[in-house]
Regions:
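Short secondary-structure boundary segments
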Residues: 86, 147, 198, 253-254
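Hydrophobic "anchor" residues
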Residues: 42, 96-97, 161-162
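Gly/Thr-rich phosphate-binding beta-strand-loop-beta motif of the actin/hexokinase/Hsp70
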Residues: 14-43, 146, 155-156
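Glycine/GP-enriched mid-protein hinge/lid loop-to-helix segment characteristic of carbohydrate kinases
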Residues: 45-47, 55, 111, 118-222
Length: 305
């Protein structure tokens, strides 16, 4: 298989549509999959409901979903590898998820999943994968805020992802934003995740983020109040991160993909907490809004080609 991949890599030099990479995002209740060629074109994408469990049967089921997803899409031996993104702290060398509150696992081996997929696999924390894809565009020094169902983060210094001493750098979602505040899924109270994750906007009515944003446009007063409170808390988090790191801040994830029309009111709120700067040009919209999982495939190309 490795030899076949090397042959494929030589073909990629001549034709970037020849070889492919796949990205998988694992969450508590779903897996998202995307297939791209080396020209960065999305060939196929899908989101499937699949509840995560720590049982070996889960790995087998993921492998079967991947096989079904890829059927009829590829010539033999043109898939260079798969990037798997996981909401948790990962020891890449040992192939272990050290801790994932979102999935409810600790010291979980990824080798069973790797064996089930039967192809080179690159594992990464979900926010780290997104940061790596963004910095390849134009942000060698930046923070990435992953505003998804849960809140994550990452940052690069001089083009290199900073992981920290214990692989925990960028866990902005579990910084205390409101002491004694709302209960976070991690067990603490007042975490930024409990105020700035996308789930804050969708949990009350079990609605989609798209439906929530449509209600903002229609002027729904209750929704507008929730949105303004959300932006207030996000502004505090942004201001704190700017003061601590003094670098660009990329707003990514599901909420980051819809914030472009609300950067002015968000910027005004941020400025109210920052007396050292006269603008918020350091706030950036994420480059990728079509498919969050696409970022994993994008990063996989760089690690396997």
């Amino acid at each position: 298989e490795i030899a076949s991949c090397l042959v494929g890599s030589e073909m990629c030099i001549r034709d970037r549509s020849y070889c492919h990479a796949m990205g998988i995002l694992i969450t508590a209740n779903h897996i998202e999959m995307v297939l791209v060629n080396l020209g960065d074109e999305i060939i196929k994408k899908d989101r499937i409901r699949l509840k995560f469990t720590a049982e070996l049967s889960y790995c087998t089921e993921v492998a079967q979903k991947v096989k079904t997803f890829l059927e009829g899409e590829l010539a033999k031996d043109t898939l260079l590898g798969i990037g798997v993104a996981i909401p948790g702290i990962i020891d890449q060398k040992e192939r272990i998820v050290l801790k994932s509150h979102a999935l409810g696992i600790e010291n979980y081996s990824l080798r069973f999943l790797e064996q089930a997929l039967e192809i080179p696999v690159y594992f990464e924390n979900d926010a780290n994968a997104a940061m790596l894809a963004e910095k390849k565009q134009k942000y060698p020094n930046a923070i990435y805020l992953s505003l998804n169902h849960t809140l994550g983060g990452a940052f690069c210094i001089d083009g290199k992802l900073f992981r920290g001493q214990n692989q925990k750098a960028g866990e902005f979602g579990h910084m205390i934003l409101v002491p004694g505040g709302r209960k976070c899924y991690c067990g603490k109270s007042g975490c930024a995740d409990a105020y700035c994750a996308a789930s804050v906007l969708t949990q009350d009515n079990r609605q989609s983020l798209d439906a929530f944003m449509e209600k903002i446009e229609s002027g729904d007063e209750k929704i507008l109040q929730t949105w303004n409170e959300y932006l207030d808390h996000l502004a505090v988090l942004i201001s704190n991160l700017r003061m601590a790191y003094d670098m660009d801040i990329i707003l990514g994830g599901d909420v980051g993909g819809v914030l472009s029309d609300y950067m002015i009111p968000l910027g005004e709120k941020v400025m109210a907490y920052n007396g050292f700067e006269h603008d918020v040009s350091y706030l950036k919209n994420c480059s990728y809004t079509v498919s969050y999982t696409h970022l994993r495939a994008h990063e996989t190309r760089g690690n396997l080609v």
